[in-house]
Amino acid sequence: MKNKKKMCFGVIIGTRAYFNSELAKDVRKQLLETLTKEGYDYVILSEDATPTGSSSIETREDGLKCAKLFRENRERIDGIIVSLPNFGFEIGIINAISVADLNVPVLVQACDDENDKVDLDSRRDAFCGKISVCNNLYQYGIPFTDTTLHTYSIYSDLLAADINKFAAICRVVNGLRHARIGAIGTRPAGFQTVRASEKLLQASGITVIPVDLSEILAAAHKIEDTDEVLQAKLKEIRQYAVVPEQYSDKLVLQAKFGVAGGKRVEANE
């Protein structure tokens, strides 16, 4: 993903019919407002899509509706945010994520109880619900990201901070998933710290394209000093580095190497 668009999250509001549905409506409203304020798009079920209302997911049937919506927006969704206004019901949530099979990062957020609001209309019990949801994700082999605190108010400043951090995680994960990395030359014998397994990288979707150093050097030496791309590279380097005049010839060599390497990248994208 090359910052191609405004980031978009699939949003799941988990609930359980035993709890007051108004809690879920409030969380939905505040979460979507925060996403919009922070500059993100979102995909979420309509408020009347499930029996519990407020886009909330409880049963497997609810989860399948959400999974269908997420699959239809596969190309848009960069990550999934699960919010628990109350204990929630793990079955609906895990089916939504597993059946959608988007293979994107997942953030799990839960709301905490207020000490003076633990009656039937106000109790949340999302602390335990989050443990259940995360345990299911673990069982299904679905990686997930936790919030700064296990639970907090949906009105907390931590919400925006956690969403922005999660967005960065999504950019890295999705950006590397199909990355192609050029490996120029062999590893120096004295630097075992930079050893890496191409097979392990490939298992994560990262492909390594090796090239002999002599090929890049040969291509660099063929570049004329008057080459327009070379002159642009020299200008670029001088904009961020101060190079003494006596080293100007070395700078030209460095720039040629950069141009040759850049052309190799373009040829193997």
Identify the meaning behind each predicted range.
Residues M1-N174, H178-N268:
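Metallocofactor- and cofactor-centric catalytic cores in central/energy metabolism, strongly enriched
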